[in-house]
Design a protein with these regions (language model features):
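N-terminal signal peptide c-region/cleavage motif recognized by signal peptidases
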Residues: 4-6
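Hydrophobic alpha-helical bundle signature of multipass membrane enzymes
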Residues: 8-104, 108-144
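Alpha-helical transmembrane segments that form the membrane-embedded catalytic/substrate-binding core
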Residues: 107-111, 149-169
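Transmembrane beta-strand segments that form the barrel wall of outer-membrane beta-barrel proteins
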Residues: 172-181
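Outer-membrane beta-barrel "beta-signal"
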Residues: 181-192
Length: 192
């Protein structure tokens, strides 16, 4: 006699979406996710303003700001366009065009958009910089555990952030730095 264990069916656009058991404790707690988000934004702004755009690291910080800005605009537009409901709102990952804000994950996109210019710039000389991918990886798992996103939401957010990060890195002059009055090529730490 054969017995069949219960199987949790996955669905969604790639057939992998399912709601994870809710876990808002320890490192997965929502307040830790928000601390990471705030820390990344402060690090980007602080590093860019402190270093300016004349040296390699400063330019990379400005590329990261470009990447994050482009990512935020793209993600918000996609959220309005797709209107997918979050796992906390429904157990059906196929609830699209319902006015939700689940697809794609903006926070995972932010993490990917932050780390990608640094990885693109420094990975050839410093392979350890790939460890920065732990930031979007952590945020992806945390967002799913707190039922803020489906699996495809975090993958799409990661992809959007990575693509804008590559684009921003490949630009000779960071866009935001170039459109500011007189640019901010000299950082606050510069000595004259």
């Amino acid at each position: 006699m054969f017995t069949v264990a219960p199987v949790h069916a996955a669905s969604g656009p790639l057939g992998i979406d399912h709601r994870l058991p809710y876990d808002n404790s320890g490192i997965w707690a929502r307040h830790n996710q928000l601390l990471l988000e705030d820390g990344v934004i402060l690090t980007e702004l602080g590093g860019a303003l402190w270093l300016g755009g004349q040296n390699r690291l400063g330019k990379t910080f400005w590329q990261s700001i470009d990447s994050s800005a482009f990512t935020a605009l793209t993600v918000q537009g996609m959220k309005y366009a797709f209107g997918r409901e979050r796992p906390s709102q429904t157990d059906n990952p196929n609830e699209w065009f319902k006015g939700g804000q689940s697809f794609p994950s903006g926070e995972v996109a932010l993490q990917a958009s932050f780390v990608t210019p640094f990885i693109a710039e420094y990975s050839h000389n410093h392979p350890w910089v790939w460890a920065l991918e732990a930031l979007p990886a952590y945020d992806a798992v945390a967002r799913m555990k707190t039922q803020g996103h489906w699996q495809t939401d975090v993958l799409a957010g990661w992809a959007v952030g990575t693509l804008w990060g590559i684009y921003a890195h490949d630009r000779q002059t960071p866009l935001i730095l170039g459109i500011m009055p007189h640019g901010i090529y000299v950082g606050l730490h510069a000595t004259f």
